[in-house]
A protein has these predicted regions:
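Extracellular/periplasmic carbohydrate-active domains that bind, remodel
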Residues: 1-221
């Protein structure tokens, strides 16, 4: 869906996409959206897939400057199995791509003005997912302070960890620490819903929240 000038010129999102019965192996992400997504990415269904030895399962990347048409919404994973995936679910709104990617404006954890350059991440939904032998963490969700991720839903999702895994940085953004066998980490998210979610063998809390407005289904740590 392109960078901001392409999104403004063509107004053409990537949408109504079905990915099913696929094997993804040995890459940075099983299914990736962004970071060049100024036209938007919407209504994506990933089902009946196997992801093996990838750094991440779902990988969403965006950043300030991608534009108000850069909407990522209605991304659904269901009936998916993962084996030896470093971080099964990653949504990163502070991706440090492009020559200015490490600047204070892109990476600031302080609220910036919401303007024509501000992207939006809406609903990201995971149902019936088995992630075995995870490495870094179960999930890493990093929104923008001024435009948090709207809603993360996990239902019938189960994680186990690889005790022999090595630490990994789950999201490519300044200040993101290397993780090992962590649970779900969420920062700048409006709403998290978890139903029948298990995390087995993690270090620390199952859910580690910072600037998350509402949590349903698990006691916020």
């Amino acid at each position: 869906a392109g960078k901001i000038y392409m999104g403004r010129t063509y107004h053409t999102p990537c949408e109504d996409i079905q990915i099913s019965h696929c094997l993804m192996e040995n890459g940075h992400g099983g299914v990736t959206a962004g970071s060049e997504m100024a036209g938007g990415v919407k209504h994506v269904r990933v089902s009946d897939c196997l992801m093996r030895n990838t750094d991440r399962g779902l990988r969403v990347k965006t950043r300030r400057g991608r534009g108000k048409d850069g909407v990522i919404d209605d991304i659904v994973f269901e009936h998916v199995k993962m084996e030896h995936v470093g971080a099964p679910f990653v949504v990163n709104c502070l991706y440090f791509c492009d020559p200015d990617g490490h600047t204070d404006w892109v990476q600031s954890r302080e609220k910036q003005p919401v303007n024509d350059g501000t992207p939006y991440v809406g609903n990201v939904i995971f149902r019936d997912v088995e992630a075995e032998h995870c490495g870094a963490c179960a999930g890493y969700f990093l929104g923008l302070p001024e435009q948090p991720i709207e809603h993360v839903v996990m239902e019938d999702v189960h994680f186990t960890f690889d005790s022999k895994a090595k630490p990994m940085q789950p999201a490519m953004a300044e200040g993101v620490e290397e993780c090992l066998n962590r649970g779900v980490i969420a920062k700048f998210v409006n709403h998290i819903t978890m139903k029948n979610v298990t995390v087995t063998g993690q270090q620390g809390d199952m859910l580690d929240c910072e600037q998350v407005a509402h949590v349903e289904g698990v006691e916020q740590q």
